[in-house]
Design a protein with these regions (language model features):
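GST-like domain detector, emphasizing the conserved glutathione-binding G-site
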Residues: 2-125
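Surface-exposed helix-capping loop/turn segments at secondary-structure junctions
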Residues: 79, 142-150
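Amphipathic alpha-helical packing segments from all-alpha helical-bundle domains
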Residues: 125-144
Length: 150
């Protein structure tokens, strides 16, 4: 049986898989493809959108999208997430979905506005993204205090 292999890039969500593997003491390999490589057809066979991260599992199957990678790791290694079937796991799943479907997209709109609007609309787009994030961060702070940021 092989090892896990993370295909990553700084700032692209691959750090989360590294944190989880280190927490449970799992050895893994990691590579950082250059921008030209992620545009090639063979990389798109891993992820049709050409995005990073991708997790290549020991048996060879591949997983893309950070939330799916987190779900794989937390279900295969004990102690990383609450037990399935418990109210605490439901809450955990809710926060994971919130991060993946609301917080990260708002962050991306704020910092990568060129994907979503013409330059003339950047300021408005960014302001809306910041406002959306503020509501979400206030919610998380209320729900998870004192566990994050004191």
């Amino acid at each position: 049986m092989g090892r896990y292999h993370i295909v990553g890039r700084a700032g692209a969500g691959s750090l989360i898989a590294e944190f989880l593997f280190r927490e449970v003491g799992v050895d893994y390999d990691i590579s950082f493809p250059d921008p030209a490589e992620v545009k090639r057809a063979d990389f798109h066979a891993r992820n049709p959108l050409g995005r990073i991260p991708v997790l290549i599992c020991p048996d060879g199957h591949q997983i893309f999208e950070t939330l799916a990678i987190i779900n794989h790791i937390t279900t295969h290694f004990d102690g990383l997430a609450p037990a399935v079937g418990t109210p605490l796991h439901d809450r955990y799943s809710q926060f994971m979905a919130l991060l993946a479907t609301s917080i990260y997209p708002a962050y991306h709109r704020q910092h990568h506005s060129h994907y979503y609007a013409q330059e003339s609309g950047f300021d408005d787009l960014r302001a809306k993204a910041v406002a959306e994030q503020a509501v979400l961060y206030d919610y998380i702070e209320f729900e998870l205090a004192p566990y994050i940021c004191g």
